[in-house]
Amino acid sequence: MFENLVIIQDQIYNVDKTECLQIGYFLDKKTNKVQIIEFFSTTKKVPKDLPKEITSLSFAFQGNKNEFIEGIQYWDTSNVADMNHMFYWCSDFNQDISMWNTSNVTNMQSMFSWASSFNQDISKWDVSNVLNMKNMFYTAEKFNQDLSTWDVSNVKREYQNIGFVNPNWKPEHWPQFNKAIS
């Protein structure tokens, strides 16, 4: 399994593991993606610069216990194609990441699943290349932003059961899926 992984840069932390001093990442030779190394759940601060080589932020902050992670608001995410499960189980996370460039992202599956406090305006994100939004906001109970203007015409796997798990999110604010399958 690990024979397909090549560490490019190690992750470096302060002593109590609350601040990442250097972002780690590796090449997955099987998928040819340059994947960020998952941060500790205690991480409160990361470098302001995301290495340009990184194309996948998959599971980056899974289970993070903080509402705010200093540094991510400045990240240039223009080279990122995969954000699946990025904030999975980040139940307190609720930070403004509206300035991220998501124009090259194709996978946002479960990006905010179980991020029950997240409720930021991400309506300006360019999601026109996203193919997979399955369970993107699953049990993100507080999320109720207006995403009705998102271009989701390329989405093949859409968010399921929006109204069931997000009762405060009005149907007129949902992305307008047309050819997606659940």
Predicted regions and their residues:
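Negatively charged
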Residues: M1-S182
